[in-house]
Amino acid sequence: KIWTSSAHRADHIMVLTRTDPDAPKHRGISFLLCDMNTPGLTVNPIINMAGDHGFNMVTFDNVRVPKKNLVGEQNRGWYVGATLLDFERSGVDYSAGGRRVLEELTDYAKNNNQNGSLISDNPIMRNRLANLAIEVEVSRLISYNIAWMQGEGLVPNKESSMGKVVGTELQQHLSETGMQMLGLHGQLEPGSKYAPLEGRIEHMHLTNVSETIQAGTSEIQRNIIATRGLGLPRG
């Protein structure tokens, strides 16, 4: 299993395994919890472009998991995993982090010059910041709706996909705008005394590449919104 988030910190890992080889497609799969200390299980780190260790490759070599670790019904693990993804994709943190970065970029634009004038006077940058403010607010409202649904015991599905698309693309739009605003200095890493905003934008720009891929790509999320949200036929 590759690209496993935080496997180096976890004490258990979720496993979807086929328990009925004759069942079609999504059926015949069971959901198990496997202790990370189980013999035969190995975790190898994957370091991203920013130098962070968040992902891992987990290898299973003749690993045995007891029946008591079955979650839900046998052969219906796919549906447990799908519900789990709905919660993982909810992304209620995107708007909060996005608002902080937007405030930092706005403050930087108000107090720094580019080509002899304040960045905040540049119509292109003003337009970008205004669009980001709209995206942050949309992400916040979607997050609040998802949080309300979860509080009511409901499972957000298309709503989580909407939240993930808006939230993850917001992160990329923020870092792209930040890199353009900061210019060449925006490429400086955290720790450099010349790095604007302590190098956070450069770090964010490198880590955000995976945001629209992990937990289901933006293309997958849009398909979910189209089919389950709008009732459109599968392509």
Describe every region a protein language model picked out.
Residues 1-44:
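A short core secondary-structure module
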Residues 2-7, 49-50, 210-215:
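Glycine-rich phosphate/pyrophosphate-binding beta-alpha loops
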Residues 3, 12-14, 31, 55-59, ...:
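Tryptophan-centric aromatic hotspots in well-structured domains and transmembrane helices
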Residues 19-21, 35, 39, 65-66, ...:
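Short, well-ordered loop/turn and helix-capping segments at boundaries between secondary-structure elements
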Residues 75, 79-87, 91-95, 182-235:
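Glycine-rich phosphate/cofactor-binding loops in nucleotide/flavin-utilizing enzymes
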Residues 51-52, 101, 172, 199, ...:
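A structural signal for short secondary-structure junctions
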Residues 110-126, 137-193:
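C-terminal helix-coil-helix/basic helical segment that borders enzyme active sites and/or dimer interfaces
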Residues 35, 41-138, 211, 227:
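Glycine-rich beta->alpha junctions and the first turn(s) of the following alpha-helix
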